[in-house]
A protein has these predicted regions:
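Conserved DEDDh/DEDDy metal-dependent 3′-5′ exonuclease domain
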Residues: 30-202
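Acidic catalytic cores of enzymes that act on phosphate-bearing nucleotides/polynucleotides
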Residues: 197, 202-266, 273-280, 301
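Beta-strand cores of modular interaction/reader domains in eukaryotic scaffold and signaling proteins
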Residues: 58-59, 77, 86, 258, ...
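The conserved glycine-aromatic submotif of the RRM
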Residues: 72, 292-299
Length: 321
């Protein structure tokens, strides 16, 4: 743990009874320190040496310059109930990041696993509660925070950072970290534990399994390799209690399409019109590389029939007219 008092603090909302599978009332607000980490010894022991007997939930995000296959990881944010840790990948270097384990794949060779993606969870809850599935992109983090079912707050500071990033894509590479950088990095994770518990209280057994399964597929989008993920943990099996009269929920697959040079524009279309039309025609998630992985690939997640349909439509767009 960090032994030097931190000059930074922030407010973290936490549920009153996080272990109960019931709607969560008003959150309790705690003042917690923000630690800037440059050495693994500054991190909690239960994080560095995890135990299967004592599982912990951590809010996780990362910042960097062009974060994808060839980008540079600059900061990893870790939210615990009693503190927020900003792991400085630039000052701490490769040894620090490898000690943390849940980092990014291409820069440090570390796989993502056991990740609860709040965007996926939000989408599954919307479907579970009978709302129409959107063919557009997942809800933004700002939109999630604004939803009164989760936090119901505005995050105006996020737009300020976005403007700075558009002006200077190397914003997160500069050192020492400014107060704005520290605040912005902490704000991206300080609500995650509360949102996590709110979502877990809403998910039923079926959507919880889909969250685990779909989340595992999404992690593979970040970490494309040449061995078809043979060295990855197995995908979560269907629980016995979801098998009714011998029928199990339809499993989903991940398909990765390589896009020839100059063809991505044909897939996306003017102002995204083409890719949106394909999404509306298929009951599958279609992700363009970049933020989700290599920029020359398209990722399709869904039931086999819908994935094959999306593949055919996308390949058709890539053909020379």
């Amino acid at each position: 743990m960090a032994s030097v008092p931190s000059p930074y603090q922030t407010h973290v909302p936490l549920p009153s009874h996080p272990d109960e599978k019931s709607p969560i009332a008003e959150p309790q607000i705690f003042v917690v320190p923000i630690h800037i980490v440059t050495h693994a010894s500054q991190l909690p022991a239960e994080f560095l040496e995890p135990s299967s007997e004592r599982q912990i939930v951590i809010g996780f995000d990362c910042e960097g310059a062009d974060l994808c296959r060839h980008g540079a990881l600059c900061i990893m944010q870790l939210a615990f109930p009693d503190a927020i840790y900003l792991v400085d990948a630039i000052q701490g270097g490769e040894m620090l990041i490898k000690a943390c384990k849940p980092a990014l794949y291409f820069q440090f060779g570390i796989k993502l696993n056991n990740v609860v993606d709040t965007q996926i969870a939000y989408s599954l809850i919307e479907e579970q509660e009978g709302r129409a599935r959107s063919s557009d992109d997942y809800i933004s983090f700002v939109g999630l925070l604004a939803d009164p079912r989760y936090c119901g707050i505005s995050y105006l500071e996020k737009e300020e950072v976005r403007v700075l990033l558009r002006q200077d894509p190397k914003f997160w590479t500069y050192r020492p970290l400014s107060e704005l950088m520290v605040r912005a990095a902490a704000d991206d994770v300080r609500f995650l534990l509360y949102i996590y518990h709110k979502m877990m209280a809403k998910l039923n057994e079926r959507t919880l399994w889909y969250l685990q399964f779909r989340g595992a597929l999404y992690c593979r989008c970040y970490c494309v390799n040449d061995n078809n993920y043979a060295d990855w943990p197995s995908l979560p099996p269907v629980p016995d209690n979801l098998i009714v009269e011998g029928k199990a929920p339809e499993e989903e697959i991940l398909s990765v399409l390589d896009v020839p040079p100059g063809k991505m524009g044909c897939i996306i279309g003017r102002r995204g019109a083409t890719i949106l039309l394909i999404k509306e025609s298929c009951n599958a998630e279609i992700l363009i590389g970049g933020s989700r992985g290599p920029p020359d690939k398209v990722f399709i997640i869904g039931a086999v029939k819908e994935v094959r349909k999306a593949e055919a439509m996308l390949r058709g767009r890539m053909l020379d007219l």
